[in-house]
Amino acid sequence: MDRLGFFKHGLSAATDVIGSVIGLKKAVNTFTEAVDEALSNIKSDIGLNLQSLQGDMCENPRNTLSEAARMGYTMIETASYSNGRIYDMKPDDFREAARKAGLKIAGAHLTKLLEDMPDATAESETDSAAAGEATTAEDPVTGWWRVALDIHRDLGCRYITMSRLPESLSDETTARYAEYFDTIGDMAAQRGMKFCFHPDKSHLTAVNGVSAFDAIAAATDPAKVWFEIDTYETAEAGIDTKALLRRYGKRVLLLHAHDYGVVGESGRIDFDPIIAEAVKRGAKDIFVEVRNYMLPPKNCVERSIYNLESLPSIRF
């Protein structure tokens, strides 16, 4: 082989090697890009209680829902219902806005105290008219909840939660609300939903040795009434959250990851073992709730999901 032939042969071999390396690099880059894309599509199933962005939801609900989805939230719990409307939107319009944003409407917080019921007949008729239904004479409790539950069932809700009780709670009042919750729970079950009670600090604080929450839990039917436990409220009440979760087990369907500011940044609530215990005991969904803002609400909500997703207890 002459020198020119040797050079050509060597150049050809080198070209083959370079081509192999470049091909390998392209393959590696393609694989890396595919992995990055796959990972970007994996989301932890963390929900957002929309009370956290209530001001934004009232101003621009569609944009706010899209922002929540961009942050990584996959489902929402609504916190605004009046006269048959959700955040002042027709239910079908709200459902479509959530669908376009890529969010499931998992649950809703609804409130109707027994003390409010003298006005409930008129309001249930207003809600029925807003929903396009004929109005008929009906027990005010049944009427208001019938319309509200029908609307939220059609939104796709799995859970209906109530978090309020009268400020002054006697034993008799507590017993009345236990019966009331059983009634709501039965109506929700007939529509394929579950009713949850969300106790706050005052409900969790023992008076004469027993808390309103424990009294209601003991008096309600476990097949009709479940619970949503809020980490901020248990902390404020001085309750051991993990012990509470162990005590009520599978009746705790929902957990509010709620801190003294951005979730996971106060140093006052250890979320990882609480979430692990909740999941172990059968909790179905976790919702971020932010009510104390050190930053603009959207920033707080975004940092909260980022912090939660870094916890070992959050599964993807």
What are the functions of these language-model segments?
Residues M1-V17:
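N-terminal secretory signal peptides and thylakoid transit peptides that target proteins
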Residues T30-R158, K250, Y306-F316:
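N-terminal pre-domain/capping segments
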Residues K90-K100, Y180-A188, L244-R247, P273-A278:
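Catalytic-core regions built around general acid/base machinery
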Residues T15, G19-I22, V28, T32:
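Residue-level detector of alpha-helical secondary structure
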Residues L53-E59, A79-K90, K112-D119, T136-T142, ...:
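Acidic-and-aromatic substrate-binding clefts and catalytic sites of carbohydrate-active enzymes
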Residues E33-G47, C58-G72, G156, N208-I229, ...:
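Histidine-acidic metal/acid-base catalytic patches
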Residues G47-Q51, E77-A79, A106-T111, T161-S163, ...:
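A cross-family glycoside hydrolase active-site/sugar-binding cleft signature
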Residues M75, K100, K104, L113-F227, ...:
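Active-site acidic/histidine proton-transfer and metal-coordination neighborhood
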